[in-house]
């Protein structure tokens, strides 16, 4: 299953790729199945997306660049008012373990390139 950000294109304030994918996956698959799934994403999930991943029961998240790098790319763009709240901290407050792998320095530049021009 793949998903792109639809926040700007469809004017949905919660339309981050991870949130939308978590919603679609929770409709298509059982919670048990999703607990064995991995969500791959270019940037560290924001607090909202981390919550959606948690509620969908997705078992693992892999991301290329930290959220603070995304903030550097977006600057003060009102479409992305970033929290300074790592997804690991969000998941740590939950009642089940979600494995987090990232950031991955070897792919950080490639992950950042996906966002080039999107937020401007």
Each language-model region and where it sits:
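Short, surface-exposed linear segments at secondary-structure transitions and domain or protein termini
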Residues: 10-12, 109-110
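A short acidic, helix-capping loop that chelates divalent metal ions and anchors anionic groups
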Residues: 7-11, 72
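RNase H-like nuclease fold core
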Residues: 1-7
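Short HxH-centered metal-ligating active-site micro-motif
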Residues: 13-48
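Zinc-dependent deaminase
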Residues: 52-120
């Amino acid at each position: 299953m793949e998903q792109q950000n639809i926040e700007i294109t469809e004017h949905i304030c919660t339309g981050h790729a991870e949130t939308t994918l978590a919603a679609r996956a929770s409709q298509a698959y059982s919670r048990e199945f999703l607990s064995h799934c991995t969500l791959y994403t270019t940037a560290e999930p924001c607090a909202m997306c981390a919550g959606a991943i948690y509620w969908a029961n997705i078992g693992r998240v892999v991301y290329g660049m930290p959220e603070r790098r995304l903030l550097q790319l977006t600057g003060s763009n009102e479409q992305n008012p970033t929290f300074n709240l790592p997804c690991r901290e969000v998941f740590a407050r939950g009642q089940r373990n979600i494995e987090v792998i990232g950031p991955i320095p070897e792919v950080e530049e490639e992950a950042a390139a996906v966002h080039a021009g999107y937020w401007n």
